[in-house]
From Swiss-Prot:
Subunit structure: The SEC61 channel-forming translocon complex consists of channel-forming core components SEC61A1, SEC61B and SEC61G and different auxiliary components such as SEC62 and SEC63. The SEC61 channel associates with the multi-pass translocon (MPT) complex.
Localisation per UniProt entry: Endoplasmic reticulum membrane
Topological type in the membrane: Single-pass membrane protein
Organism the protein comes from: Gadus morhua (Atlantic cod)
GO molecular function per UniProt: protein transmembrane transporter activity; ribosome binding
Higher taxonomy: Eukaryota, Metazoa, Chordata, Craniata, Vertebrata
Cysteine disulfide links: none
Membrane-crossing residue ranges in chain numbering: 33-61
Protein name (record): Protein transport protein Sec61 subunit gamma
Residue ranges, Extracellular side: 62-68
Any one Pfam family match given in the protein's UniProt record, by short name: SecE
Record keywords: Endoplasmic reticulum, Membrane, Protein transport, Translocation, Transmembrane, Transmembrane helix, Transport
Record family assignment: Belongs to the SecE/SEC61-gamma family.
Record topological domains on the Cytoplasmic side: 1-32
Length: 68
């Protein structure tokens, strides 16, 4: 019986902690959601521009190396 409790107790504690976490979580309000969405959009745009410029720079370099 003691061995069974050794396996059951960590699971029980995990479920208890998970329920407590879900109860404490709150949905963001409209202003907070817009701020997070704007920050994410700006991050995507910056990464896109970086990728575009890296590609733009490496195309001519690749053509010179390959000898096109």
């Amino acid at each position: 019986m003691d061995q069974i409790m050794q396996f059951v107790e960590p699971s029980r504690q995990f479920v208890k902690d998970s329920i407590r976490l879900v109860k404490r979580c709150t949905k963001p309000d409209r202003k907070e959601f817009q701020k997070i969405a704007m920050a994410t959009a700006i991050g995507f745009a910056i990464m896109g521009f970086i990728g575009f410029f890296v590609k733009l720079i490496h195309i001519p370099i690749n053509n010179i190396i390959v000898g096109g």
